[in-house]
Each structure stands twice: as structure tokens, then as C-alpha cells.
Regions:
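Charged, low-complexity intrinsically disordered terminal segments
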Residues: 1-43, 49-63, 69-365
Length: 365
């Protein structure tokens, strides 16, 4: 928030979209948010703010995460904006992945331009409401920015974006419908169509929570190509409900003809990526679950680049080495860097209960 406040003070137009549920849980009464919303050149809006008179709409969340700058640069991925995801290197509780797109001369088909149009569509929704800030004359955010700049000057050095990025053959934005309502699974369907194009598909996702229709798609995909998922092991995953559901659904998942790498790497995986063949890489916010398919706003960026694909396969290979590979026939192989950590008895008992309790609400996990 300090960086956004400082940008506005320099005359930059700043617009911030915040998920309404996240704002209720984490930003209620936030002096920093009030200072930001009250500042000249700053606007803050909430997507589907919590209304206890409309409890049926609480579950529609804004789950995508991105930053747009000057119509030529965007950063997009699965990383939430809090300390669990933005701590110093090696201290974050979750492993995540983002992709930066630099387009100094964007045309109307450019992914950055597509993301601008997407932002405008969400910003103008009836269910997106402005935050009215209180101007108390406070300067806490500007003071925080000055302290950050003094303490970490290397983070503020100019960046040669052309030199820091890799030329690619194409980038395309995929997204869900934007309204706060039950959604047709447009993004899931698009991902399935992409996966159908490759003979070797590798998916990294925090959890696998599928509907009957999603299982049908996985069976069709698993029957005609190599399809593997890299996901959290129940010993290392941070989402208790997702891990409990996996235990209850594991046999059904493997029955789709897919391989599963159960990763135990010291951190909980929060990355969302799909690699199709040796060219396509898809990165964004979409979890392989029903909430991402049917309820939330989601974004995925499709990158056509053998070089990026190879880089990502190399990174994911490290996670595979720290995994327990489970095959469709139930046989298992431990990776070269896999270190077994026993599941505590208390956690095992909790999973045993939760795997049954979550069944009626799997679509909300």
C-alpha cells in the first residue's frame, strides 16, 4: 500500500480492486486502506463486498491477482498480497509463481491490452463498490515508503525490462466470466481444450477437487496422453480441507489414468501452471478445483515459447524430485530428494473426520 500511495503522490492514477470477503476478513477498519482510498489520484473498490442480507452471494470471490502498469507491463499469477506470500526469499510459507509480460508497443491483441479490458469490465460491475476513505491527514504510508527505500535501495533501482524478459511467440489471456454469480466453466473448458493439443501434459496445482464433469474430462485426457499432476502431499499441504478431500478422492483421481506427484518440499505449494507439450505454458490463478471452475473470477496466461516451457519444466522437476509419485495402478516411487515426514497422529485423525465432513461442501473448498 505504501508503494501505491507514493505513486499517487507523484501524480500517477492508481486504481485498486480488492476482493470483498478478503476486505471483510483482513482489512476491516484498516487505517492504511482508508489513507489509500482518501488520497488524491487513488481509487479503491471492493468486488462483491460482504452483505449479510445476501448470504447466497458470499461465495463469489475475486481470486485473480495482477498488476497493470502504463498499458505496457503486467504481472500476473497466483500470489496473494500478504506476508505468507511476499516475505523475504526463503521465509515465505508458500511457494508461488507469477509471470511478467512487457509489451512496449502493445496492439489490440496484446495480452496486456486484454488484461486492461478485463480490469475495466470488473471495475465497472454493479457489484463492485467504491471505498470511501477518510482523510485524516496521516502520512504513515508515505513514511513507510521512505523507510523501505532507505532500507532496501536495491529494490528501487531501474530495471531494463527488455533485457530481463524472454521474447516469446505469443501470449493470450484466458478468464472466467466476471459477474458475482454461478459461472459456466469457460476457463476450465479452455484449459481442457489446450491440454487436448499435447501428448505430454504436466499440471502444478495446490489441490485437486473435481466435480463429476471435471472427472469426465480428466478421464478423457488421461486416456490419450501422458498427464501428471504435481500437488501438495497431505503431510505438507497448508489447506486442511483440500488435503482431506484428496484423501477421500485419491482413488477416483488415479482412476482417471493420471499420475500424481505428492510434493513434500518444506513449503506448501500455491503454484498454478499447466505445461502442454514443449511449447505452451499456462500460468495464473486457477486451481484445479470446483471453486475456480464455477464460482470465482480467475485468470490464466497462455505463453507460446519453447524456452519458457523448458525453464518451467526444469523448475517443476525439482518439485518432482521432492515428491512421492503415485501411479494409476497405485504403485509408488519416491523422488531422489524426497524425505519422508510422518503424518502426526492428531492430523491423521483430523483428516479422517474432515474427509467425510467436507463432502457436502466440496464445491466451496
Amino acid at each position: 500500500m505504501a508503494a501505491l500511495r507514493e505513486a499517487a503522490a507523484r501524480g500517477v492514477r492508481v486504481r485498486v480492486l480488492v476482493d470483498g470477503m478478503n476486505a471483510r476478513l483482513n482489512l476491516q477498519g484498516s487505517a492504511a486502506l482508508q489513507e489509500l482510498a482518501a488520497a488524491e489520484n487513488d481509487e479503491v473498490r471492493l468486488y462483491n463486498p460482504v452483505d449479510l442480507l445476501r448470504p447466497g452471494e458470499i461465495n463469489y470471490r475475486m481470486h485473480d491477482k495482477y498488476i497493470l502498469v502504463d498499458g505496457s507491463l503486467c504481472l500476473l499469477g497466483g500470489r496473494n498480497t500478504n506476508d505468507r506470500f511476499l516475505s523475504r526469499t526463503g521465509q515465505a510459507e508458500n511457494d508461488d509463481r507469477d509471470v511478467l509480460v512487457y509489451a512496449p508497443q502493445p496492439d489490440e491483441h496484446c495480452a496486456v491490452r486484454q488484461l486492461e479490458n478485463y480490469f475495466a469490465a470488473v471495475w465497472s460491475l454493479e457489484e463492485t463498490r467504491p471505498v470511501t476513505g477518510r482523510d485524516s491527514g496521516g502520512t504513515a504510508l508515505l513514511e513507510r515508503y521512505a523507510a523501505l527505500r532507505s532500507g532496501w535501495p536495491e529494490a528501487f533501482e531501474p530495471v531494463d525490462w527488455s533485457g530481463a524478459t524472454t521474447p516469446v511467440d505469443g501470449v493470450t489471456l484466458l478468464h472466467n466470466p466476471v459477474g458475482a454469480e454461478n459461472k459456466t466453466p469457460e476457463l476450465w473448458d479452455a484449459l481442457v481444450h489446450l491440454m487436448e493439443q499435447g501428448g505430454d501434459v504436466l499440471v502444478q496445482t495446490p489441490y485437486l477437487i473435481c466435480s463429476s464433469a471435471m472427472y469426465d474430462d480428466l478421464r478423457a485426457l488421461g486416456g490419450g496422453r501422458e498427464l501428471a499432476f504435481v500437488t501438495n502431499s497431505v503431510e505438507g499441504g497448508a489447506n486442511l480441507f483440500g488435503c482431506a478431500d484428496y484423501l477421500g478422492q485419491k482413488e477416483k483421481i488415479l482412476g482417471c489414468g493420471v499420475e500424481v506427484y505428492e510434493t513434500l518440499c518444506g513449503h506448501s505449494l500455491h503454484t498454478k501452471a499447466v505445461l502442454v507439450g514443449d511449447r505452451l505454458s499456462v500460468i495464473g490463478s486457477f486451481n484445479m478445483d470446483m471453486r475456480s471452475a464455477y464460482l470465482d473470477t480467475e485468470l490464466m496466461l497462455v505463453i507460446d515459447s519453447p524456452e519458457i516451457n523448458a525453464q518451467l519444466r526444469g523448475v517443476i522437476a525439482d518439485y518432482q524430485a521432492s515428491s512421492r509419485l503415485v501411479r494409476p495402478d497405485g504403485t509408488q516411487t519416491e523422488g531422489t530428494a524426497y524425505v519422508y515426514v510422518p503424518l502426526p497422529a492428531g492430523k491423521r485423525a483430523l483428516y479422517g473426520v474432515l474427509r467425510y465432513l467436507v463432502r457436502p461442501i466440496r464445491h466451496l473448498l
